Amino acid sequence: MEPHVDPTVSLCYKLLSDVARVRHLLSDEDTESLVHSIVSSRLDYGNSLLYGINKCVLQKYQHVQNYAARIISKRSKRQSVSDVLVKLHWLPIEKRIIFKILTFVYKTLNGMAPESFTTLISIRDHDMLLLNNVYLDSSYGRRSFTYTAPRFWNALPFNIRSSVSLEIFKRLTKNYLFNHFSALKSTAFLYQA
């Protein structure tokens, strides 16, 4: 995936440096809107495929997101941007990837995703909206949607899985990932083969 990541990161840095040059001319709201439109779409494009990829490759995306937050908040590179990410309600890259996977599962179960996704997951319990876990031996296979999606989905609380609309699901999932990410991750892979 590095052939995809490196050009994306390079382009984002170039575009963000252009925004940084004119930052003093823009209002905070305009800067946030501009940065969001430039960076988020590029970082989110196909990012669910990045699950399980080498952490140093993911870190490149995280640096881009941090740089974008620094431009919006007018912070120097020595200052932390963790609180800025929370204020902007931006999930860190690793959480964004899991958010995207969970959104695909929700769309698949509710008939909003392409039909090809329906063959990748199967429901184990209709009442509790639980999915069948697939067991794979290879580390490559464990990065697949078929393997990871049921584990993260089943680890979500029932009130999130049973959301009545995509907007509500996204809002609840994002809040849950902000507050309970480590619990979700450990629960999802508790019984990993």
Annotate each predicted stretch with a short phrase.
Residues 1-193:
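Hydrophobic/basic alpha-helical segments
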